[in-house]
Amino acid sequence: MSERRAKIACIVMASGEGKRFSSKKGGKLLAPLGGIPVLKRVLQALPIEEFCDVVVVTRWPEVETMCNTMQIKCVRHDNPLRSDTIREGMRAVIDGAADPSDMPDACLFVAGDQPLLTTCSVKCLLQTFRDAFGRGQSAVCRLCWKQEAGNPVLFPAAMFEKLRSLEGNRGGASLLRRADMKGKGIQDEEIQNKEIHDKDNQDEGVQVLIVEAGSPYELMDVDSPEDLAELEAVLHG
């Protein structure tokens, strides 16, 4: 049991090139949705006050400029792979801890191209982890729709070294093996009694808690102009 409130950092993955989208600098991340850039919508959904640190990781100078305007920490890199983005974000978060006691207890990984993500869903992910932390449990928390898991994903500190050791184009989800998944809905916040022995890390002693989103569109990312048009219709529908 822990009486201390868990410290949670946030890493926003904003390095995607969006090759299917456009050649414009910033690609899909700066494409307007309802007059607001896709990435800016994601950042506006984050309850900044709930995090001990927030870092955007990108290859785009235009994204860095936007983050500076919003007073959000940004790390730029030139490496091509997903694991590079994770490693750069983890380095920024860990190096940002001046003292071992400042180290986060968990880190939430957010995709920069999910513009309809809501603050409600993010807060529910954080609270789900904090509830488990208070019970002395180590848990991964994932947003899902009808128990189909997606992003964001929150990883406990017990998995930080494995995240930093990822190679190639592997993301954090590749670490999840054979762990129990239990669902938690945003509306009733009732833990369901269904366990899914599927894709997680039971040998790490880490359970996976899935948190139901308010709509499937929260999990939808923007990979093409068609995706953007669909989300535009949802936004104004």
Regions found by a protein language model. Give the residues of each.
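Conserved beta-loop-beta/alpha segment of the NTase-like Rossmann-fold superfamily
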Residues: N79-R164
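Conserved N-terminal catalytic core of the sugar/cofactor nucleotidyltransferase
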Residues: S2-R4, K40-A106
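N-terminal nucleotide-binding beta1-loop-alpha1 segment
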Residues: M1-S23
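Short beta-strand/turn micro-motifs composed of small residues
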Residues: A14, T58-R59, A111
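Short glycine-enriched, charge-decorated loop/helix-capping segments at active-site entrances
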Residues: K25-P32, Q71-V75
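Short catalytic helix/loop segments, enriched in acidic residues and glycine
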Residues: K28-V42
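Short aromatic/basic micro-patch
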Residues: P32, L116, L154, D221-V222
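Conserved alpha/beta core of the MobA/IspD/sugar-nucleotide pyrophosphorylase nucleotidyltransferase superfamily
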Residues: S2-A6, C10, E161, S165-G237
